[in-house]
Regions:
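Structural motif at the C-terminus of the N-lobe alphaC helix and the adjacent alphaC-beta4 loop
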Residues: 83-92
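Short beta-strand micro-motifs within the conserved protein kinase catalytic domain, predominantly
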Residues: 96-107
Length: 152
């Protein structure tokens, strides 16, 4: 069962008729959980219906500004993330961007879900293993170096 009913999709995604259409991009996904709520947009865990792939869907709402001049918005932020994911698509250290679409003015970025530990869980689980922490830090330094070599 989807996390949202058709009526809830209409309300939460601020749409009128598009979400109720079977062709709407959001209907390609079974929403499982809201991971994070924010005024700039939410983050959802979902499953792509066509193949069962676990995905993360990031929503960006327009007109949410980050700077005093109003020149950098939440929409710019997530579009920049999509651009970077495309530039780094052949790298093993980034997740794959699988889809992007608009519903009315909201922009959605879809990427494969990567199972693993978040930073706090990693610190807790490796608290007695300095060797693992050092190897992980070395990997992070190598990744940042590789990204910088690409001019990013």
């Amino acid at each position: 069962m989807d996390l949202f009913s058709e009526e809830e999709k209409r309300i939460y995604f601020q749409t009128t008729c598009e979400v109720s259409s079977k062709d709407s991009a959001i209907n390609k996904y079974k929403m499982e959980k809201i991971i994070k709520r924010s005024n700039k947009g939410n983050v959802y865990r979902a499953i792509r219906k066509s193949d069962g792939q676990k995905v993360i869907i990031k929503q960006s709402r327009p007109f949410v500004n980050y700077d005093a001049e109003g020149e950098w918005t939440a929409l710019d932020d997530i579009k920049n993330e999509a651009h970077m994911l495309k530039k780094l698509a052949d790298k093993s250290y980034t997740t794959n961007l699988t889809d992007e679409f608009y519903i009315v003015d909201d922009y959605f970025l879809v990427q494969e879900q990567v199972d693993g530990l978040n930073f706090e869980e990693f610190i807790r689980e490796t608290e007695h293993s300095l060797n693992i922490r050092e190897k992980t830090l070395d990997n992070i330094v190598n990744i940042v170096s590789d990204i910088h070599k690409l001019g990013i």
